[in-house]
């Protein structure tokens, strides 16, 4: 096992495009770190730099106290699991798992012991004679993980390994991956664009956007105290509601002091709706119900703020002006009708305040 430290890591491609813009973070020994962000944010590029599949322009990558910038991937003591499984179609499951060990000249008895142990852990012992084409997607992914396990690396690297699986199987496999990592105690770095996957897997969450790290913390810390409006809107489903604090149709007070300009955020589950206005500190909104989504135990209410002639709005990307919708999460049966006029309120302790450009959280 080993810790992984990135110090001011940068990647600039020929032509001047800067894909990674000075990334710093540390993954502790045995921790499960998830890099999460939208497509094109640089998360897979960063993982490939840790693996040695992509060169770095500047900075240092430290694995277990050793700077690996100039070290070949095969010598970094890491194992990588890919999205497309990367299995040899003409080889059996056993030979796929044993192939890398044979190339390293490992004795046959040790190879067999490692393969059998990995197969036992992953519950694929009855499949060792099968070819990949005879396996389901989930079984193939287990074989890919088994191939990584037999190497007994210091660090596991996962590049969106569940993207090709259906929704039900993704849930099952992410539980298996987390259980496996805890059992082995091996440091892991995992890339995904799925914020739910990230929240459920991570010890430490690294939220990326356009080549920079927006926030680092535990999943609960990032969800409860987002550092920027990007994080607030990306982490959480449905996302946090964001609005200009001084826009028409937004009334917010904190104790006896009214706030000034800025961006106000509130999670959908922290809004309470009623048919009559409530006199309370915090946030008060007038809404017209535009759409309703019933998803079993809960219902999402989409409303539009009641206001006239106000062009202001807020975006997770400064400079953009999205529709001025508000989302409220309520228990499954508690929903008004489309077209109803409602009032939504939130207590001060449930509100989040950001600077006007969305780049800084302001503590209340």
Swiss-Prot record:
EC numbers: 7.6.2.10
One CC-aspect GO term: ATP-binding cassette (ABC) transporter complex, substrate-binding subunit-containing
Any GO molecular function: ABC-type glycerol-3-phosphate transporter activity
Domain of life: Bacteria
Predominant cellular place of this UniProt entry's protein: membrane
The name this protein goes by in its record: sn-glycerol-3-phosphate import ATP-binding protein UgpC
CDD domains on file: ABC_MalK_N
SUPFAM superfamilies: MOP-like, P-loop containing nucleoside triphosphate hydrolases
Name of one Pfam family that matches: ABC_tran
Membrane-topology descriptor: Peripheral membrane protein
Catalytic reactions of this protein: sn-glycerol 3-phosphate(out) + ATP + H2O = sn-glycerol 3-phosphate(in) + ADP + phosphate + H(+)
Function, as annotated: Part of the ABC transporter complex UgpBAEC involved in sn-glycerol-3-phosphate (G3P) import. Responsible for energy coupling to the transport system.
Keyword Cell membrane applies: yes
Family of the protein in this entry: Belongs to the ABC transporter superfamily. sn-glycerol-3-phosphate importer (TC 3.A.1.1.3) family.
Cellular localization per UniProt: Cell inner membrane
Gene Ontology BP term (one): carbohydrate transport
UniProt keywords, alphabetically: ATP-binding, Cell inner membrane, Cell membrane, Membrane, Nucleotide-binding, Sugar transport, Translocase, Transport
Subunit structure: The complex is composed of two ATP-binding proteins (UgpC), two transmembrane proteins (UgpA and UgpE) and a solute-binding protein (UgpB).
Binding positions for ATP per the UniProt entry: 37-44
Domain ABC transporter: start-end pairs: 4-235
Alphabetical list of PANTHER family matching this protein: MALTODEXTRIN IMPORT ATP-BINDING PROTEIN MSMX, SN-GLYCEROL-3-PHOSPHATE IMPORT ATP-BINDING PROTEIN UGPC
């Amino acid at each position: 096992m080993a810790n992984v430290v990135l110090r001011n890591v940068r990647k600039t491609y020929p032509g001047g495009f800067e894909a990674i813009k000075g990334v710093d973070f540390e993954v502790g020994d045995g921790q499960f770190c998830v890099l999460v962000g939208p497509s094109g944010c640089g998360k897979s590029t960063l993982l490939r730099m840790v693996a040695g599949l992509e060169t770095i322009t500047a900075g240092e990558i430290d694995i277990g106290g050793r700077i690996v910038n100039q070290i070949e991937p095969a010598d970094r003591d890491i194992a990588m699991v890919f999205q497309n499984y990367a299995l040899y179609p003409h080889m059996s499951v056993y030979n796929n798992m044993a192939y890398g060990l044979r190339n390293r000249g490992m004795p046959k008895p040790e190879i067999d012991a490692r393969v059998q142990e990995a197969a036992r852990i992953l519950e694929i012992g009855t499949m060792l004679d099968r070819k990949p084409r005879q396996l389901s997607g989930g079984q193939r992914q287990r074989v890919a993980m088994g191939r990584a396990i037999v190497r007994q690396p210091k660090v596991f690297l996962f590049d969106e390994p569940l993207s090709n699986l259906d929704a039900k199987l993704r849930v099952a496999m992410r539980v298996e991956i987390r259980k496996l990592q805890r059992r082995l105690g091996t440091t892991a770095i995992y890339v995904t664009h799925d914020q739910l996957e990230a929240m459920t897997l991570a010890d430490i969450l690294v939220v990326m956007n356009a080549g920079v790290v927006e926030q680092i913390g535990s999943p609960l810390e990032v969800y409860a105290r987002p550092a920027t409006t990007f994080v607030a809107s990306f982490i959480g489903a449905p996302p946090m509601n964001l609005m200009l604090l001084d826009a028409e149709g937004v009334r917010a007070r904190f104790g006896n002091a009214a706030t000034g300009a800025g961006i106000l955020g509130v999670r959908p589950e922290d809004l309470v709706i009623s048919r009559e206005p409530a006199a309370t500190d915090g946030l008060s909104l007038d809404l017209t119900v535009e759409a309703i989504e019933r998803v079993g135990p809960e219902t999402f209410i989409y409303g539009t703020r009641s206001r006239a002639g106000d062009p202001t709005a807020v975006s997770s990307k400064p400079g953009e002006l999205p529709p001025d919708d508000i989302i409220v999460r309520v228990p499954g049966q508690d929903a008004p009708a489309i077209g109803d006029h409602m009032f939504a309120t939130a207590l001060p302790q449930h509100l989040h305040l950001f600077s006007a450009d969305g780049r800084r959280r302001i503590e209340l």
